[in-house]
Amino acid sequence: MIQWRSIQHGDEAAIVAVFIASVHQVARRDYPPEQLAAWAPETGIDPVAWCAPLFQDDTLVAVSAGRIVGFANMTLAGYLDRVYVAPTHQGQGIASHLVSVLERHARAHGVHRITVAASHTALAFFKAQGYQVVWANIVERDGVRIGNTIMAKVI
């Protein structure tokens, strides 16, 4: 059974592990190895520093059997920044639930439009959640260009 809660100090290492596993095991079908390595380096990430912005945002985690298996965060302005689910827990509705709860929180705080930079891997997921393509986008990480899609949803 999945339990839902806000991020807590001490979650950082588990959150970074979910991020890295999700990128390298799930997104590899849509991105080459050099882009995956730039997006989610498998070594050298400081979990506390990487997670620091999550404590400024509305951040939820999904917990199963005492382990974090997913997380998502949204800024106060309505930018859905990170949505990641462990490869072992994909397809169970975890991301849908996390996004839905964050959308409700945003609406309750007066946000009427949510934006997200969706990876190629997550594009179909966000379309199914009612997000619409705004434009194709390129980000650069460590000199490597990585494609994604800016999407938006009116709530």
Predicted regions and their residues:
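Conserved GNAT acetyl-CoA-binding A-motif
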Residues: A106-S119
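Conserved active-site tyrosine of GNAT-family acetyltransferases
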Residues: F126-K127, Y131
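Acetyl-CoA-dependent GNAT
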Residues: S6-H9, A17-Q90, V99-V101, H105, ...
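Conserved G/P- and acidic residue-centered "switch" motifs that form tight phosphate/ATP-binding loops
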Residues: G93-A95
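Conserved catalytic-core motifs of GNAT/GCN5-like acyltransferases
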Residues: T115-A117, Q132-I150
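Extreme N-terminal starter segment of soluble prokaryotic enzymes
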Residues: M1-Q3
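Exposed loop/turn and edge beta-strand positions of beta-sandwich/beta-sheet ligand-binding modules
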Residues: Q56, Y79, H112, R145-G147
